[in-house]
């Protein structure tokens, strides 16, 4: 048993024959030889894949072809769509024709509407007869009355008599106005002096009748 354990623990040399000890984890090679082995594998894989220089050359050749005129199909499709989306040049004549057309339509429609209204109103207007209405007489009388009152108010008020009717003496504010309608001075103010025409007796009798009505008892009816 001891011999077997010693035999298993004995170191093993590198499989490449470099003289160093190998490791079963690195396929029996030493660390240096294992690194070189990995580098060789990587280099061999890189030769199979296309180099970076060829890729850059392809990317440079594409814009050159586009400049020469050989445009890819995708680029031509994009150009065609963009050209279809862009509006074409609009001429001044087309704009003028579009602006004039609505105005002509509006004017023609207005003329038709006016002609129709005239046709409808024509027979009715011919059949109608204007009526003349005279203002009522009461209204005319009421309008004339204020005018007459205004004319009277505009007239100058009559001046009061300031002279005695008998002696023609100026009495001013000290004159006495009699019931007969004349003004007299202090001497001629009495009715018996200036022979007054006013009937004082009849006036007094009328006042007595109004103030003292006749009182008559009811008659006794016989049974």
Swiss-Prot record:
Zn(2+) 1 binds at residues 14, 18, 30, 33. Residues 77-110, 137-148 have a biased composition (Polar residues). One of its GO terms (molecular function) is polyubiquitin modification-dependent protein binding. The keyword Repeat does not apply. A zinc finger (A20-type) spans 8-42. Zn(2+) 2 binds at residues 164, 167, 185, 188. Pfam families: zf-A20, zf-AN1. The A20-type zinc finger domain mediates regulation of NF-kappa-B activity. The AN1-type zinc finger domain mediates association with TRAF2. Involved in regulation of TNF-alpha induced NF-kappa-B activation and apoptosis. Involved in modulation of 'Lys-48'-linked polyubiquitination status of TRAF2 and decreases association of TRAF2 with RIPK1. Required for PTS1 target sequence-dependent protein import into peroxisomes and PEX5 stability; may cooperate with PEX6. In vitro involved in PEX5 export from the cytosol to peroxisomes. Residues 41-155 are annotated as: Disordered. This is AN1-type zinc finger protein 6. It comes from Mus musculus. One of its GO terms (cellular component) is cytoplasm. Zn(2+) 3 binds at residues 178, 180, 194, 196. PANTHER family: AN1-TYPE ZINC FINGER PROTEIN, AN1-TYPE ZINC FINGER PROTEIN 6. The modification N6-acetyllysine is found at residue 219. The modification Phosphoserine is found at residue 49. A zinc finger (AN1-type) spans 158-204. It is found in: Cytoplasm. Keywords: Acetylation, Apoptosis, Cytoplasm, Metal-binding, Phosphoprotein, Protein transport, Transport, Zinc, Zinc-finger. Interacts with PKN1. Interacts with TRAF2. Interacts with mono- and polyubiquitin. Interacts with PEX6. Interacts with PEX5 (Cys-linked ubiquitinated). One of its GO terms (biological process) is protein transport. PROSITE patterns: ZF_A20, ZF_AN1.
């Amino acid at each position: 048993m001891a011999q077997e354990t010693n035999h298993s623990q004995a170191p093993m040399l590198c499989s490449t024959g470099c003289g160093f000890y190998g490791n079963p984890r690195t396929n029996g090679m030493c660390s240096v030889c294992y690194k070189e082995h990995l580098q060789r594998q990587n280099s061999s894989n890189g030769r199979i894949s296309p180099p970076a220089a060829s890729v850059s050359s392809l990317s440079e050749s594409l814009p050159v072809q586009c400049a020469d005129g050989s445009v890819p199909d995708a680029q031509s499709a994009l150009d065609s769509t963009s050209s279809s989306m862009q509006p074409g040049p609009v001429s001044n004549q087309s704009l003028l024709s579009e602006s004039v057309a609505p105005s002509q339509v509006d004017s023609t429609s207005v003329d038709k509407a006016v002609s129709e209204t005239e046709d409808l109103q024509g027979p009715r207007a011919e059949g109608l007869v204007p009526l003349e209405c005279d203002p009522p007489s009461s209204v005319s009388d009421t309008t004339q009355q204020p005018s007459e009152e205004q004319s009277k108010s505009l007239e100058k008020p009559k001046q009061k008599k300031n002279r005695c009717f008998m002696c023609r003496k100026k009495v001013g504010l000290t004159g006495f106005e009699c019931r007969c309608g004349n003004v007299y001075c202090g001497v001629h103010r009495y009715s018996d002096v200036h022979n007054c025409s006013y009937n004082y007796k009849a006036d007094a009798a009328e006042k007595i009748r109004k103030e003292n009505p006749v009182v008559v008892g009811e008659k006794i009816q016989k049974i």
